[in-house]
Design a protein with these regions (language model features):
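Phosphate/nucleotide-binding beta-alpha loop and adjacent structural elements of enzyme active sites
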Residues: 1-169
Length: 169
């Protein structure tokens, strides 16, 4: 948890020195609140929000604690997910897939390890688009070609993206 307060030139930035989790309360030395409560406290209930989340493993509990109604109201979620074998991971992925399409998956090459198999890394950036606004293109290649935005997180470390075999012609 990094409580540094970045500046936002020309914008309004309100920083809350708290963590997101599945319930409200203190744990160890930190205060946690739910995603829904944080949205409400910011005055954003009912507004179209794009959620950007990188909370070092707490995403699993916070998303399990989020109601289906809250998730249905969010058009897009961009987040780094952490872990590969925790019991909550499959439950969260299934929950997200009820409402969202996973449209981008990029493995953080700072976390590449064979120990995360079958995944190539234990940290991965994802982008989820709500099914009520996303439209699947049946003619698009699966997986989609890698975007230049998915450059390696570390330019000096080997990359470890999933590779799919291409049919030979």
């Amino acid at each position: 948890f990094d409580p540094a307060r970045p500046t936002c030139s020309g914008g309004t930035f309100v920083f809350h020195n708290e963590c997101v989790g599945d319930r409200t309360g203190h744990r160890e030395s930190r205060f946690f609140d739910t995603l829904e409560n944080q949205i409400r406290k910011n005055g954003d209930t009912g507004r179209r929000l794009i959620i950007k989340m990188d909370i070092e493993g707490a995403e699993w509990d916070s998303l399990l604690g989020a109601s289906d109604e809250l998730l249905a109201s969010i058009p897009q979620i961009t987040m780094e997910m952490h872990g590969f074998d925790g019991p909550k991971i499959l439950e969260v992925i299934r929950k997200l897939k009820r409402t969202f399409y996973l449209v981008n998956l990029h493995f953080n090459n700072w976390s590449c390890t064979s120990g995360a198999a079958p995944l190539p890394a234990w940290a991965y950036q994802t982008h989820w688009v709500n099914k009520r606004i996303g439209v699947i293109d049946p003619a698009a290649p699966v997986p989609a070609p890698m975007s230049p935005l998915n450059a390696p997180d570390s330019p000096t470390r080997p990359d470890c993206q999933l590779r799919t075999s291409r049919p030979e012609h």
